[in-house]
Amino acid sequence: MSQSLHRRTVLKCLVAAAASTAFGCHDDEPPVEDGRAYFPQSVASGDPRALSVVLWTRAVDPERPDADIAVTLVVARDEAFEHRVLEETGLLAMASHDHTLQVKVTRLEPRTRYYYRFIVEKDGQRLGSPVGRTRTAPAYDSKTPVRFAVANCQDFRGRYYNSWHRLMQLGEDLDFVLFVGDYVYESDSSAVPSPDPARVVRFSDPGSALPRDLGGGREELVAQSLSNYRDLYRTYRSDPFLQRVHERYPFIVVWDDHEFSNDCWDAHATYTDGRTEEFQPERRRNAELAFFEYMPLDTDAGAGVIDPEELPRYPDTRIYRDFIFGKHLRLFVTDYRTYRPDHLIPEDAYPATVAMDAAVLASLGLTGAFAADAFAYVNIDEFPAQRAVLRGAYVQLAVGAGLTAEAASMRAEALVKGNLALAYANPVLQAAAQPGAGPIDPAGKPRGLAFVHMGKQELFSSIGARNVVIKDTFDVYAAWRYSTSDGAAQQALGKDQEAWLLGQLREGVSPQTWKVMASSVSTTSMIWDLRAKPDVEPPTVRNRYYFSVDQWDGFPDKRSSLLAALRERTDGHALVVAGDIHAAFASVEQGVPCLTAPAISSSAVQEEAGAAVEAAGFPPGSAVYRYVVTEQAATFREGNPGIAFVDTNAHGFTVVEVGPEEVKAAYHLLPSSEVDVDYGSRPGDLAASFSRSDFRVRPGGTIDAA
C-alpha cells in the first residue's frame, strides 16, 4: 500500500459528527495550557451552514518543525468547554500540507454559537490553541435578519490591518465575514520597502520564485512554487488582528487574481503584457493548493478531515458554491477568474491593426458612425515602402521593450501587414521622414475600427488593453465579438458556472427573499467622461474611458445578460457584493444594486490612478490629472449616474444586514493615508479616524442614503 493511499484512507475514516447531547470534561483531565507557540497562525472557521461548519488550524512543533503532529479537536457550546459536543482525537497536522488541518463538523444545530480549540499533547502537557468562536447558519425557516461583513484586498507589505482592528473594536454581531478576493498578494517586499520588519514578505526559497521586472531598474519576486505560496499565507496569517477576526467569525472566501497572479485569466499571467508566453498551469495549481490548505472551505457533503490534495485543481477546479441563511438570504459565491477568457484587447496587439473593417461596420449599419478621416485605413501591403518603415519602427520599439532583434523582426513581419489604421501609421511615417515613404492620404480610403481607436498606443501595455480603454469604440468591438463568438468571448463565469447560477435562480428553486451574488470584481460601471472638458489637452484625449476592463466593464454584454437574469428571476430582490477595485461604491446597474467594499489595506484606487496618469505624461496640475485623480469620485459619478456613493481614497469594510423588507449597508471607512500608521499601539485613537456611511437597498433596485 502506498504512503499516499494509506494517508487518504486514514483521513476518510475520521468522521467529525457532533454529539446530539453535550458532555462535560473528565474529572481527571489535565488542564489545557497556553500552546499558542504550537499554533502560529491561530485558528479559523469557514463556510457555515445550518448543520455544519469547517474548522481550521496550523499546528507545528517548534522543536520538530518538519514532523507531523497529532492534534485533538474539541468543540463546545461554551467558552469554558464544560458543555462539549465533539472531542475528536487522532487528527494529524501533516508536514506534507504545511501542517494545516481542516475538519468539517456536522450534526450541529442551526444559528448556534460554538467554541472550539485544537490541543497538542507533549511531555504530559495539553497545549491548546487560541479559542475560536463560530456560528452556524440559521435554519431554512428562520426569519432572523442575517448580518455579515464584506472585505477584500489586504496587501500586507508595509501596511497595517487597521480595518480589521476596527471591526474587532466594534464587536459586530455577525453571522460571517464574506471575503471576496485578494486575501494574499503574490509579490514579496523587494519593491515595497517597509520600516517595520514585521510587515515584510519574504520567500523561504527565493530561488523557486519568479523574478518580475517592474521597469526603471526595479524588480520583485512573485510566488511560483508551492513553497512560495505557502509563505504568503503563513506571513499574512501572522497578523494579530487578522487572527482575531478569524477566531471570532466564520469566513466565506473566494479568490480573485492575486491569490495566483495579477489580472490573471484561466492559468495565464499578464506581467509581461504579451512580450512572453505566460501560460502557467503548474504555478496555478500550486496557488490553488496553498489556498485550499489555508482556507476552511466546505468542499463536499461528507464530515471529517478535508484533504486538500484530493480537491480538484486546474483545469478541473470548482470553488463556486451557495449558502442558505434562513428565509431571507441565498448567497451565491461566484468565481470570476478560473473560467474567464482573455481580455478582449490583447496587451500585445499592434495598435494599427484593424479589428473591424469597412465590410463589418457596414453589416452592422455603422458606416456613418465611423466616417471621419480618423478611422481611415489601408492595406499596407499595397504600400511596401511605408510598410518597411513601420516594420523598422516596430522592431526598434520592441527591442526597447526587451525583445531580441530576431523576435522583434518576426513579430513585425507577422503583425505589420494587412489592414492598418492611418491614425497610428501616419504619425510614425511622419516622424520617420523617409523619402518616398511619407504619410498616406486618408481621402477615399475605407473606414474601420482599429485597436488604436480603443486607446491602444503602445506595443506591450495594459493601457488600452486591460486599463483605460475608450468606452464607445470598445463597446462596439465588444458587442461584435460577443455576437460572432456566440457569447464565448465574454463568458466570464464559464458555461457550467453560469448554468448553475441561472438554474438556481429559476422560479421555486430559491424561495429566499434576497438573492445575493458575491463577485470578486464589481459590476459597477466606472467611467471617466472627458468629452465635454475643453481644458483637457490634447483634444484627442476628450473621450469616455472605462477605468478598468479587467472587471465586469470588460464584458459589457455578458454583464447585461447576467444582470437581466438577476433582476427578472428574483422579482427585484437581487444584489451584487464585490471588491477588487480598492474603492467603495454603491450603485444600481441595469436595475440591480451593487455594493463594492473598499480594500482592507491595498493601495486606494485614487493613489494608483495618480501614478498611472503621471506616467502617461499628465502631471499634477494638468486638467487630466485633476479630473481623473484629484476629482476622481466626482468624475465617476458624472460618468455613471447610477452611482449613489463612491469613495476612492479610503480603506475599510462594509457591514450588510439582510432582512425581509430591505438590505442595510454600512460603509466603515478609513483615509488611505492611515494605512502606514500602526494603531495597534494606540487603539484609543482609531475610532476617530473612521467615518461611516449608511444606505438602504430596497426591492426593485434602489439605493437610498439611510
Q: What would you call each of these model-derived segments?
A:
Residues 26-104, 108-706:
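Long, structured stretches of catalytic cores involved in phosphate-ester chemistry, encompassing
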Residues 1-18:
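N-terminal secretory signal peptides and thylakoid transit peptides that target proteins
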